[in-house]
Protein backbone atom coordinates (compact mmCIF):
# COMPACT_ATOMS: atom_id res chain seq x y z
CA UNK A 1 0.00 0.00 0.00
CA UNK A 2 1.40 3.40 -0.98
CA UNK A 3 1.91 6.16 1.52
CA UNK A 4 3.33 4.31 4.53
CA UNK A 5 5.76 6.62 6.27
CA UNK A 6 9.44 5.81 6.07
CA UNK A 7 11.05 4.76 9.33
CA UNK A 8 13.02 8.01 9.28
CA UNK A 9 9.85 10.10 9.03
CA UNK A 10 8.17 8.09 11.78
CA UNK A 11 11.10 8.65 14.15
CA UNK A 12 11.36 12.34 13.26
CA UNK A 13 7.69 12.75 14.14
CA UNK A 14 7.99 10.71 17.34
CA UNK A 15 11.16 12.37 18.65
CA UNK A 16 9.89 15.89 17.95
CA UNK A 17 7.60 15.74 20.98
CA UNK A 18 7.76 14.74 24.61
CA UNK A 19 6.77 11.25 25.75
CA UNK A 20 3.11 10.61 24.92
CA UNK A 21 1.12 9.32 27.89
CA UNK A 22 -2.54 9.33 28.77
CA UNK A 23 -5.63 7.18 29.00
CA UNK A 24 -8.56 5.79 27.08
CA UNK A 25 -11.07 8.45 28.00
CA UNK A 26 -14.80 8.55 28.56
CA UNK A 27 -16.41 10.93 31.06
CA UNK A 28 -17.58 9.22 34.24
CA UNK A 29 -21.22 10.14 33.59
CA UNK A 30 -21.32 8.28 30.24
CA UNK A 31 -22.91 4.85 30.17
CA UNK A 32 -21.33 4.17 26.78
CA UNK A 33 -20.02 5.92 23.67
CA UNK A 34 -23.49 6.90 22.52
CA UNK A 35 -23.76 8.87 25.75
CA UNK A 36 -20.36 10.39 25.09
CA UNK A 37 -21.28 11.77 21.65
CA UNK A 38 -25.06 12.14 21.25
CA UNK A 39 -26.91 15.44 21.64
CA UNK A 40 -29.00 14.27 24.60
CA UNK A 41 -27.16 15.30 27.76
CA UNK A 42 -24.06 16.45 25.92
CA UNK A 43 -23.70 19.84 27.61
CA UNK A 44 -23.61 18.29 31.07
CA UNK A 45 -21.27 15.54 29.92
CA UNK A 46 -18.90 18.03 28.33
CA UNK A 47 -18.75 19.83 31.69
CA UNK A 48 -17.83 16.52 33.31
CA UNK A 49 -15.22 15.85 30.62
CA UNK A 50 -13.75 19.32 31.13
CA UNK A 51 -13.42 18.73 34.87
CA UNK A 52 -11.88 15.29 34.40
CA UNK A 53 -9.53 16.39 31.61
CA UNK A 54 -8.24 19.13 33.90
CA UNK A 55 -7.48 16.37 36.40
CA UNK A 56 -5.78 14.35 33.65
CA UNK A 57 -3.51 17.29 32.86
CA UNK A 58 -2.77 17.76 36.55
CA UNK A 59 -1.86 14.07 36.72
CA UNK A 60 0.70 14.62 33.97
CA UNK A 61 -1.14 13.23 30.95
CA UNK A 62 -0.84 14.94 27.58
CA UNK A 63 -3.06 12.74 25.40
CA UNK A 64 -6.29 10.74 25.39
CA UNK A 65 -7.57 7.94 23.19
CA UNK A 66 -11.21 8.35 22.20
CA UNK A 67 -13.38 5.89 20.29
CA UNK A 68 -16.00 7.49 18.08
CA UNK A 69 -19.56 6.19 17.61
CA UNK A 70 -20.68 5.76 14.01
CA UNK A 71 -24.39 5.68 14.92
CA UNK A 72 -24.28 9.21 16.34
CA UNK A 73 -22.43 10.55 13.29
CA UNK A 74 -24.96 8.81 11.04
CA UNK A 75 -28.11 9.98 12.84
CA UNK A 76 -26.99 13.40 14.13
CA UNK A 77 -24.34 14.26 11.58
CA UNK A 78 -24.00 18.04 11.83
CA UNK A 79 -24.39 18.06 15.59
CA UNK A 80 -21.87 15.26 15.99
CA UNK A 81 -19.25 17.11 13.97
CA UNK A 82 -19.76 20.21 16.11
CA UNK A 83 -19.60 18.21 19.34
CA UNK A 84 -16.43 16.39 18.29
CA UNK A 85 -14.76 19.72 17.60
CA UNK A 86 -15.81 21.06 21.00
CA UNK A 87 -14.48 17.90 22.65
CA UNK A 88 -11.12 18.35 20.94
CA UNK A 89 -11.09 22.01 21.99
CA UNK A 90 -11.85 21.06 25.59
CA UNK A 91 -8.96 18.61 25.71
CA UNK A 92 -6.58 20.95 23.90
CA UNK A 93 -7.09 23.82 26.33
CA UNK A 94 -5.69 21.48 28.99
CA UNK A 95 -2.69 20.62 26.82
CA UNK A 96 -4.13 17.25 25.81
CA UNK A 97 -4.19 15.85 22.29
CA UNK A 98 -6.55 13.13 21.06
CA UNK A 99 -5.94 9.81 19.36
CA UNK A 100 -9.09 9.07 17.34
CA UNK A 101 -10.38 5.52 16.85
CA UNK A 102 -12.95 4.43 14.26
CA UNK A 103 -13.64 0.70 13.83
CA UNK A 104 -14.09 -1.67 16.75
CA UNK A 105 -14.36 -5.45 16.73
CA UNK A 106 -15.26 -5.84 20.41
CA UNK A 107 -18.81 -6.87 19.56
CA UNK A 108 -21.26 -9.46 20.96
CA UNK A 109 -22.89 -12.00 18.63
CA UNK A 110 -26.37 -11.43 17.26
CA UNK A 111 -28.12 -13.83 19.64
CA UNK A 112 -31.21 -13.66 21.85
CA UNK A 113 -29.55 -11.00 24.04
CA UNK A 114 -28.49 -8.75 21.17
CA UNK A 115 -30.21 -5.40 20.74
CA UNK A 116 -29.51 -2.77 18.07
CA UNK A 117 -27.87 0.42 19.29
CA UNK A 118 -30.23 3.37 19.59
CA UNK A 119 -29.91 7.02 20.47
CA UNK A 120 -31.66 8.36 23.55
CA UNK A 121 -31.39 7.49 27.22
CA UNK A 122 -28.81 4.75 27.71
CA UNK A 123 -29.56 2.04 30.23
CA UNK A 124 -26.84 0.45 32.34
CA UNK A 125 -26.50 -2.36 34.87
CA UNK A 126 -24.48 -1.89 38.04
CA UNK A 127 -21.72 -4.36 38.78
CA UNK A 128 -20.69 -5.19 35.22
CA UNK A 129 -17.66 -4.18 33.16
CA UNK A 130 -18.97 -1.89 30.44
CA UNK A 131 -22.19 -1.27 32.35
CA UNK A 132 -24.14 -4.14 30.80
CA UNK A 133 -24.92 -7.62 32.06
CA UNK A 134 -24.75 -9.03 28.54
CA UNK A 135 -21.97 -7.36 26.60
CA UNK A 136 -18.93 -7.88 24.43
CA UNK A 137 -16.81 -8.35 27.55
CA UNK A 138 -17.73 -11.99 28.10
CA UNK A 139 -17.11 -15.33 26.45
CA UNK A 140 -19.26 -16.27 23.49
CA UNK A 141 -19.18 -19.17 21.10
CA UNK A 142 -20.43 -17.24 18.08
CA UNK A 143 -18.89 -14.51 15.97
CA UNK A 144 -19.41 -10.90 17.01
CA UNK A 145 -21.94 -9.07 14.86
CA UNK A 146 -21.02 -5.79 13.19
CA UNK A 147 -23.36 -3.64 11.12
CA UNK A 148 -20.43 -3.01 8.77
CA UNK A 149 -20.92 -6.54 7.46
CA UNK A 150 -23.79 -5.06 5.41
CA UNK A 151 -22.09 -3.56 2.31
CA UNK A 152 -24.50 -0.63 2.19
CA UNK A 153 -23.79 0.24 5.82
CA UNK A 154 -20.07 -0.20 5.29
CA UNK A 155 -20.20 2.39 2.51
CA UNK A 156 -21.48 4.87 5.10
CA UNK A 157 -18.61 3.90 7.42
CA UNK A 158 -16.21 4.73 4.61
CA UNK A 159 -17.77 8.20 4.36
CA UNK A 160 -17.47 8.57 8.15
CA UNK A 161 -13.77 7.79 8.18
CA UNK A 162 -13.09 9.93 5.11
CA UNK A 163 -14.91 13.00 6.42
CA UNK A 164 -13.32 13.02 9.85
CA UNK A 165 -9.75 12.38 8.71
CA UNK A 166 -10.17 15.00 5.96
CA UNK A 167 -11.51 17.51 8.49
CA UNK A 168 -8.64 17.05 10.95
CA UNK A 169 -5.78 15.95 8.68
CA UNK A 170 -3.74 19.06 9.53
CA UNK A 171 -5.05 19.68 13.05
CA UNK A 172 -2.54 19.50 15.95
CA UNK A 173 -5.35 18.60 18.36
CA UNK A 174 -5.40 15.14 16.77
CA UNK A 175 -2.16 13.29 17.50
CA UNK A 176 -2.68 9.84 15.90
CA UNK A 177 -5.27 8.04 13.77
CA UNK A 178 -5.99 4.61 15.30
CA UNK A 179 -8.10 3.26 12.47
CA UNK A 180 -9.45 0.04 13.96
CA UNK A 181 -9.68 -1.24 17.53
CA UNK A 182 -8.66 -4.89 17.94
CA UNK A 183 -9.46 -6.12 14.44
CA UNK A 184 -10.42 -9.79 14.41
CA UNK A 185 -11.65 -9.85 18.01
CA UNK A 186 -14.96 -11.48 19.01
CA UNK A 187 -14.18 -14.46 16.75
CA UNK A 188 -14.43 -12.21 13.70
CA UNK A 189 -10.97 -13.21 12.48
CA UNK A 190 -10.40 -12.51 8.78
CA UNK A 191 -14.00 -11.35 8.23
CA UNK A 192 -12.79 -7.93 9.31
CA UNK A 193 -9.75 -7.81 7.03
CA UNK A 194 -11.49 -5.99 4.11
CA UNK A 195 -12.77 -3.33 6.51
CA UNK A 196 -9.33 -2.74 8.00
CA UNK A 197 -7.69 -2.62 4.60
CA UNK A 198 -10.23 -0.11 3.30
CA UNK A 199 -9.83 2.20 6.31
CA UNK A 200 -6.08 2.25 5.71
CA UNK A 201 -6.59 2.93 2.00
CA UNK A 202 -8.81 5.92 2.80
CA UNK A 203 -6.27 7.32 5.25
CA UNK A 204 -3.48 6.97 2.70
CA UNK A 205 -5.54 8.77 0.05
CA UNK A 206 -5.99 11.71 2.43
CA UNK A 207 -2.36 11.69 3.70
CA UNK A 208 -2.82 13.38 7.10
CA UNK A 209 0.09 14.95 8.97
CA UNK A 210 -0.57 12.53 11.82
CA UNK A 211 0.65 8.91 11.79
CA UNK A 212 -1.76 6.08 11.05
CA UNK A 213 -1.86 2.86 13.06
CA UNK A 214 -3.97 0.01 14.40
CA UNK A 215 -2.91 -2.08 17.37
CA UNK A 216 -1.75 -5.66 17.46
CA UNK A 217 -3.55 -7.27 20.37
CA UNK A 218 -3.14 -11.05 20.07
CA UNK A 219 -0.52 -13.51 18.76
CA UNK A 220 1.98 -10.66 18.97
CA UNK A 221 4.86 -13.04 19.69
CA UNK A 222 4.27 -14.75 16.33
CA UNK A 223 2.85 -12.01 14.07
CA UNK A 224 3.84 -13.75 10.84
CA UNK A 225 1.25 -16.44 11.60
CA UNK A 226 -1.58 -13.92 11.75
CA UNK A 227 -2.89 -12.24 8.57
CA UNK A 228 -4.15 -9.15 10.38
CA UNK A 229 -0.96 -8.66 12.41
CA UNK A 230 1.18 -8.97 9.29
CA UNK A 231 -0.93 -6.32 7.57
CA UNK A 232 -0.78 -3.96 10.56
CA UNK A 233 3.00 -4.25 10.89
CA UNK A 234 3.46 -3.54 7.19
CA UNK A 235 1.02 -0.63 6.99
CA UNK A 236 1.22 1.27 10.29
CA UNK A 237 3.43 4.36 10.44
CA UNK A 238 4.10 3.70 14.11
CA UNK A 239 3.56 0.30 15.72
CA UNK A 240 0.88 0.09 18.39
CA UNK A 241 -0.13 -2.79 20.59
CA UNK A 242 -2.45 -3.75 23.44
CA UNK A 243 -1.30 -5.82 26.38
CA UNK A 244 -2.91 -6.52 29.71
CA UNK A 245 -0.19 -9.09 30.36
CA UNK A 246 2.52 -9.08 33.01
CA UNK A 247 5.65 -6.98 33.24
CA UNK A 248 7.78 -9.84 31.91
CA UNK A 249 5.42 -10.45 29.00
CA UNK A 250 5.53 -6.77 28.04
CA UNK A 251 9.33 -6.72 28.12
CA UNK A 252 9.37 -9.52 25.56
CA UNK A 253 6.70 -7.84 23.41
CA UNK A 254 8.48 -4.49 23.45
CA UNK A 255 11.77 -6.10 22.40
CA UNK A 256 10.03 -7.94 19.56
CA UNK A 257 8.06 -4.94 18.30
CA UNK A 258 11.06 -2.61 18.48
CA UNK A 259 12.94 -4.98 16.18
CA UNK A 260 10.79 -3.65 13.31
CA UNK A 261 12.61 -0.32 13.57
CA UNK A 262 9.63 1.97 14.16
CA UNK A 263 8.37 3.85 17.22
CA UNK A 264 6.21 1.65 19.45
CA UNK A 265 3.23 2.72 21.56
CA UNK A 266 0.84 0.82 23.83
CA UNK A 267 -2.73 2.06 23.44
CA UNK A 268 -4.36 -0.22 26.03
CA UNK A 269 -2.88 -1.42 29.31
CA UNK A 270 -3.61 -1.55 33.09
CA UNK A 271 -5.19 -4.68 34.50
CA UNK A 272 -4.32 -4.77 38.19
CA UNK A 273 -6.30 -7.97 38.72
CA UNK A 274 -4.05 -9.84 36.28
CA UNK A 275 -0.82 -8.20 37.48
CA UNK A 276 -0.49 -5.43 34.91
CA UNK A 277 0.06 -2.55 37.33
CA UNK A 278 0.92 1.13 37.32
CA UNK A 279 3.94 0.49 39.58
CA UNK A 280 5.55 -1.86 37.07
CA UNK A 281 4.27 -0.79 33.68
CA UNK A 282 4.49 3.02 33.79
CA UNK A 283 8.23 3.13 34.62
CA UNK A 284 8.85 0.49 31.94
CA UNK A 285 7.05 2.54 29.31
CA UNK A 286 9.00 5.64 30.40
CA UNK A 287 12.37 3.89 30.21
CA UNK A 288 11.62 2.35 26.82
CA UNK A 289 9.93 5.55 25.59
CA UNK A 290 6.78 3.64 24.71
CA UNK A 291 3.84 6.04 24.38
CA UNK A 292 1.10 4.65 26.61
CA UNK A 293 -2.63 5.05 27.18
CA UNK A 294 -4.07 3.03 30.08
CA UNK A 295 -7.70 1.98 30.03
CA UNK A 296 -10.00 4.26 32.00
CA UNK A 297 -9.64 7.38 34.10
CA UNK A 298 -12.43 8.28 36.55
CA UNK A 299 -14.64 5.38 37.64
CA UNK A 300 -18.18 5.87 36.44
CA UNK A 301 -21.22 4.39 34.76
CA UNK A 302 -19.10 2.36 32.33
CA UNK A 303 -17.63 0.53 35.34
CA UNK A 304 -14.35 -0.66 33.92
CA UNK A 305 -12.97 -1.04 37.43
CA UNK A 306 -14.98 -4.30 37.41
CA UNK A 307 -13.43 -7.39 35.77
CA UNK A 308 -14.45 -8.43 32.31
CA UNK A 309 -17.54 -10.62 32.52
CA UNK A 310 -15.47 -13.30 30.83
CA UNK A 311 -13.09 -13.39 33.81
CA UNK A 312 -16.03 -14.23 36.07
CA UNK A 313 -17.07 -16.95 33.63
CA UNK A 314 -13.57 -18.43 33.73
CA UNK A 315 -13.53 -18.37 37.53
CA UNK A 316 -16.93 -20.05 37.72
CA UNK A 317 -15.60 -22.79 35.44
CA UNK A 318 -12.59 -23.41 37.67
CA UNK A 319 -10.10 -21.10 35.95
CA UNK A 320 -8.75 -17.59 36.60
CA UNK A 321 -7.22 -18.67 39.91
CA UNK A 322 -4.35 -16.20 39.54
CA UNK A 323 -6.74 -13.23 39.33
CA UNK A 324 -6.69 -10.81 42.28
CA UNK A 325 -10.35 -9.91 42.77
CA UNK A 326 -9.53 -7.55 45.67
CA UNK A 327 -8.27 -4.75 43.41
CA UNK A 328 -9.76 -2.65 40.65
CA UNK A 329 -9.28 -3.81 37.07
CA UNK A 330 -8.93 -0.46 35.20
CA UNK A 331 -9.37 3.26 36.07
CA UNK A 332 -7.20 5.60 38.14
CA UNK A 333 -9.62 7.81 40.10
CA UNK A 334 -12.67 7.19 42.25
CA UNK A 335 -16.14 8.66 41.69
CA UNK A 336 -15.24 11.60 43.96
CA UNK A 337 -12.04 12.33 41.97
CA UNK A 338 -9.78 11.03 44.73
CA UNK A 339 -7.13 8.59 43.48
CA UNK A 340 -7.87 4.89 43.64
CA UNK A 341 -4.32 4.63 45.00
CA UNK A 342 -2.47 7.90 45.75
CA UNK A 343 0.86 6.10 45.35
CA UNK A 344 0.00 5.30 41.73
CA UNK A 345 -0.73 8.93 40.95
CA UNK A 346 2.47 10.10 42.65
CA UNK A 347 4.46 7.66 40.53
CA UNK A 348 2.73 8.76 37.31
CA UNK A 349 3.43 12.41 38.07
CA UNK A 350 7.08 11.67 38.81
CA UNK A 351 7.75 9.92 35.52
CA UNK A 352 5.77 12.45 33.50
CA UNK A 353 7.91 15.19 34.99
CA UNK A 354 11.10 13.25 34.24
CA UNK A 355 9.99 12.69 30.63
CA UNK A 356 9.38 16.39 30.07
CA UNK A 357 12.77 17.22 31.60
CA UNK A 358 14.38 14.67 29.28
CA UNK A 359 12.71 16.23 26.24
CA UNK A 360 13.76 19.74 27.25
CA UNK A 361 17.36 18.48 27.38
CA UNK A 362 17.03 16.82 23.99
CA UNK A 363 17.33 13.32 25.42
Where are these regions (language model features)?
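Catalytic domains of carbohydrate-active enzymes that cleave complex glycans
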Residues: 345-363
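Active-site mouth of glycoside hydrolases
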Residues: 1-236, 242, 247, 259-260, ...
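Conserved active-site loop/cleft motifs that coordinate metal ions or position small ligands
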Residues: 266-267, 292-296
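C-terminal beta-signal and adjacent terminal beta-strands/loops
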Residues: 303-306
Amino acid sequence: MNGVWSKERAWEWYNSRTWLRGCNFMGSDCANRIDQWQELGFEQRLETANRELALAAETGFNSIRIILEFLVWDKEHDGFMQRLDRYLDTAWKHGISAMIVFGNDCMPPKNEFWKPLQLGEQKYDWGYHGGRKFSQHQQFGGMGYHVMDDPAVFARHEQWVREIISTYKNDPRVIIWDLYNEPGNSHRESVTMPHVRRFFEIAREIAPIQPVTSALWRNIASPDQDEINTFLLENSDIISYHSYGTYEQNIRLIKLLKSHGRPVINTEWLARMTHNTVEQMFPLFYLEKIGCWNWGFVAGLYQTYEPWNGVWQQWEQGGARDVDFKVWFHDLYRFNLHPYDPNEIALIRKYCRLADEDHALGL
